[in-house]
């Protein structure tokens, strides 16, 4: 229940940010404004933020842990908001949504977003008792690799299977540089000091809570990336409970598909 409470409080903070996006754009240093708005609601709804909020607009989303939050938020940017409320029990949520600042994804932004969403769906589908923790990343990263291959971004002659080879491949890591999951609870990276056999290679069991958070990141100066993608970074992260026969997405109440995110922004800003 503590995790459900943390997720519910985090949704309040995200919706407060969405409601205030026009002011964040107009006032300058919008990343700081977003950080402040979320922090205010985190402190009011719970004990405070669970970790330093990542409020990364435009190209800043391509810096994995952008916590400086010093930049402007501009019309046409994507805002990557990675934040969580720690409730009074000290359990914390850890959720990421990537939001089109003006309420509408461009075609290129949607193309990236849809790829990440498909990867996350694959990762969530791998969350079930008996699967290894590492199976989540394997499922998600295969979808990422398939999209990069379809876009012609893998080196000539390199197949999806080639890049997934852990010893001789990994070409996809130029654009997806992190793991897809971590355990979550009292610590935002729960059990982070566990051995590999107790963590990455361990079987999932009912009651575990973990994140599923693939992403794609195209720096503004990345000449290997299609020009239409440059300066856009997308991550989608949800908090998932392992159940007896599969999993439950605890943060399913926060929209994830591109269409639903656009509708969410319209609905919140019309209140």
Q: Could you say what each language-model-derived stretch is?
A:
Residues 1-271:
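Active-site neighborhoods and metal-handling regions in enzymes and metal-associated proteins
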């Amino acid at each position: 229940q503590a995790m459900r409470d943390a997720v519910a409080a985090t949704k309040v903070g995200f919706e407060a940010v969405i409601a205030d996006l026009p002011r964040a754009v107009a006032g300058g240093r919008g990343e700081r404004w977003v950080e402040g708005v979320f922090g205010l609601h985190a402190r009011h709804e719970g004990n405070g933020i669970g970790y330093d909020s990542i409020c990364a607009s435009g190209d800043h989303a391509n810096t994995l842990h952008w916590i400086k939050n010093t930049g402007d938020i501009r019309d046409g940017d994507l805002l990557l908001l990675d934040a969580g409320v720690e409730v009074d029990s000290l359990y914390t949520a850890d959720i990421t949504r990537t939001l089109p600042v003006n309420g509408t994804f461009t075609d290129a932004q949607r193309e990236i977003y849809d790829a990440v969403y498909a990867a996350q769906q694959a990762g969530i589908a791998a969350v079930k008792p008996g699967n290894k923790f590492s199976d989540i990343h394997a499922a998600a990263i295969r979808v990422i690799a398939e999209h990069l291959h379809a876009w012609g971004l893998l080196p000539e002659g390199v197949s999806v299977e080639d890049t997934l080879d852990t010893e001789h491949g990994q070409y996809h890591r130029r654009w997806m540089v992190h793991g897809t999951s971590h355990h979550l609870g009292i610590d935002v990276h729960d059990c982070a000091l566990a051995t590999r056999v107790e963590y990455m290679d361990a079987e999932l069991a009912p009651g575990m809570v973990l994140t599923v958070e693939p992403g794609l990141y195209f720096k503004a100066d990345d000449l290997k990336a299609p020009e239409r993608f440059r300066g856009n970074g997308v991550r989608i992260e949800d908090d998932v409970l392992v159940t007896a026969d599969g999993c439950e997405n605890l943060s399913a109440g926060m929209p994830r598909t591109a269409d639903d995110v656009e509708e969410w922004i319209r609905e919140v800003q019309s209140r």
